[in-house]
Amino acid sequence: MGNSFGHLFRITTYGESHGGGVGVVIDGCPPLVEISEAEIQAELDRRRPGQSRITTPRNEADRCEIMSGVFDGKTTGTPISILVRNKDQRSKDYSEMKEKYRPSHADFTYDAKYGIRNYEGGGRSSARETIGRVAAGAIAKKILQQVAGVEIIGYVKRIKDCEAVDIDPNQVTLAQVESNIVRCPDAAAAEKMIALIDEIRKQKDSIGGVVECVARNVPVGLGMPVFDKLEADLAKGAMSLPASKGFEIGSGFAGTLLTGQEHNDEFTVDDQGQIRTKTNRSGGIQGGISNGENIVLRVAFKPTATIGKEQQTATRAGEEATLAAKGRHDPCVLPRAVPMVEAMVALVLCDHLLRHQGQCRTLS
């Protein structure tokens, strides 16, 4: 349970960090969507380990294989299965963690819930699980772009106390994001962020930060009232990512400092006769339904739990102990979290697009 996400465009991820591989089954994808392994691979390459000195040195190519659901380069409407085989497992690095719990990791809670856990790489709690999400997100992005011209771009907004301020979510480009290894389009801030990560890596410690993501050209009407509000599903998707600890959309928590008059997005009519808002403090969503403005959201990620510094912990037998974790881990998850956040946004928007068309376009 808990391994599937979505309603009409529904994904189920499978596999473990040190098993034979990881992947995803996508159910509900419309037929005749042109997709290739190369398009999916381009997204996975942004997520894969070992891509720079500030990410985990685990050496995985993460080559994807489409096992079913695509024929002659087009989706068939049947379940799509995508597999990525694990190649660079080093299970011996985790032998000490068989008995000792990593502080702030899922080790203890998995053990307490199930009475058993895969301590090699964390099993299902490993960030390698997100490979399936990113692969599915590549297809969701293709559908969104093809049907509605939606563009989704994520980037690192802040690492520790270093925040990028010279970013316009309405104008930022993928090329700007990918211009440096930290995936921050503010070049000056990016240099400082990289220096921060380099220093913390040398100390065998870790740091966290914030990913901001914008979805542009989102059509009006996506989202459902009450329990299936668009921002609620976006929050669920974002908060299901490993190491995520916070979510906000539009003005977020800063909006609590404003009055209603200051915060309200006043309406206007543009030159094409379309109803627009003068500002976008709502973040593109009002009443749980997209209003046609850009959706802007932020996701906070904690520092990586597995660090090489010695920490106080406990064993499965209930004895106090110390642990200096071995293994290969990200000193900061933010650079690789960018495509993960984009994927979850794409999955939610694609699902709601199909649901909207099914309910509201049936008789039109």
Swiss-Prot record:
Family: Belongs to the chorismate synthase family.
Residues the entry annotates as binding NADP(+): R47, R53
CDD domains to which the protein is assigned, alphabetical: Chorismate_synthase
Xref: PANTHER family: CHORISMATE SYNTHASE
Cofactor binding note of this UniProt entry: Reduced FMN (FMNH(2)).
Protein name: Chorismate synthase
Protein task: This reaction introduces a second double bond into the aromatic ring system.
UniProt-recorded Gene Ontology molecular function terms: chorismate synthase activity; FMN binding
Annotated source species: Picosynechococcus sp. (strain ATCC 27264 / PCC 7002 / PR-6) (Agmenellum quadruplicatum)
EC code: 4.2.3.5
Residues that bind FMN: R124, S125, S126, G287, K302, P303, T304, A305, T306, R328
Gene: aroC
Highest taxon listed in the record's lineage: Bacteria
Record HAMAP family: Chorismate_synth
